[in-house]
């Protein structure tokens, strides 16, 4: 805390990390709020014709946020270069995922016609392979 070389001189946390020169737009403390930010970046990539891809990582709790559903709809409509990665640890705040969602989380994207795949997040090679297939 308070280190001159730390994030925000040691007075900030990971939600303040950003480096736009590297395409890192930052994070924030609001559940799921990085998802539409990533869509905005994906739309910008399309408009600019850069060939870039926007990626957002979020937890399973964000799957219950309306902003995720809005983002899925817009991303599908506009065929945006967006990769969404849900890190499902089986808990959404204080509730087990099984008591919060009626269906498999990876199937939600199917309602919007978006390619999706569920993989074991503890298998780094399976995650890398799935990500490669998603952006191919």
What would you call each of these model-derived segments?
Residues 1-78, 99-102, 106, 110-113:
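Cofactor-binding active-site loop characterized by glycine-rich and histidine/acidic residues
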Residues 82-136:
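Thiamine diphosphate
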């Amino acid at each position: 805390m308070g280190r001159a070389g730390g994030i925000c001189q040691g007075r900030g946390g990971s939600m303040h990390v950003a480096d736009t020169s590297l395409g890192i737009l930052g994070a924030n403390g609001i559940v799921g709020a990085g998802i539409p930010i990533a869509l905005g970046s994906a739309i910008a990539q399309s408009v600019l014709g850069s060939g870039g891809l926007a990626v957002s990582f979020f937890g399973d709790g964000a799957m219950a946020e309306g902003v995720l559903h809005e983002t899925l709809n817009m991303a599908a409509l506009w065929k945006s270069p967006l990769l969404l990665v849900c890190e499902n640890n089986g808990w959404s705040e204080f509730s087990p995922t099984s008591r919060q969602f009626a269906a498999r989380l990876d199937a939600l994207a199917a309602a919007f016609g978006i390619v999706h795949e569920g993989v074991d997040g503890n298998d780094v090679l399976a995650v890398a392979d799935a990500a490669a297939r998603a952006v191919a």
